[in-house]
Amino acid sequence: MFKRNAINWLEKWKIKNNRKPLVIRGARQVGKTSLVKEFAKQFDDFLYFNLEIADDLVLFSKEVSIDTLYEMMLAVRRKTKSIGTTLIFIDEIQNSSLAIKMLRYFYEEMPHLYVIAAGSLLETMLNKDVSFPVGRVEYMALRPCTFDEFLGAMGEDASTYISPTAGFATG
């Protein structure tokens, strides 16, 4: 994984006092999942759920309390509550309107947890009877890599391509 500038934004989100769950939007294959998995290395515990996988989606098949949902998440991943930092990542969240709804309760009742959700088709959910937790989540749009990110992935930087005398006639 090459360094994405968005990591810096995630690090600022992590230290916010009144941090809300984060919803990362973006087209398919722009690196949402890879970005969050790289960011997850900064946490003591990481719980990853991909709602394209039936065993993960079943967690959101019935409405339960946020405490019960968190206990179920821990049990499914064979983890216990941590005194350290825990990042919960719900990938492909557009597959469950209940998962979207539960983001509100992570914010209101479990603010000590770091929660990120990602999806590529979230705009299509607006046409359905889905209640997005307005004011209780933050959004971030992830785009394809920038030129600087591309150069970094190639082991180069922009100074290789930009001459301090570019644009000036000589002789």
List the model feature ranges, each with a label.
Residues 1-17:
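Pre-Walker A adenine-sensing motif
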Residues 35, 39:
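Hydrophobic positions on the alpha1 helix immediately C-terminal to the Walker A/P-loop
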Residues 24:
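Hydrophobic anchor at the beta1->P-loop junction of P-loop NTPases
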Residues 89, 114-120, 141, 150:
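Structural recognition of the conserved hydrophobic beta-strand(s) that form the central parallel beta-sheet
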Residues 80-99:
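Conserved P-loop NTPase "ATPase switch" module shared by AAA+ and STAND
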Residues 32:
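Conserved lysine of the Walker
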Residues 51-84:
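Short glycine-rich substrate-engagement loop in P-loop NTPases that contacts/grips substrate
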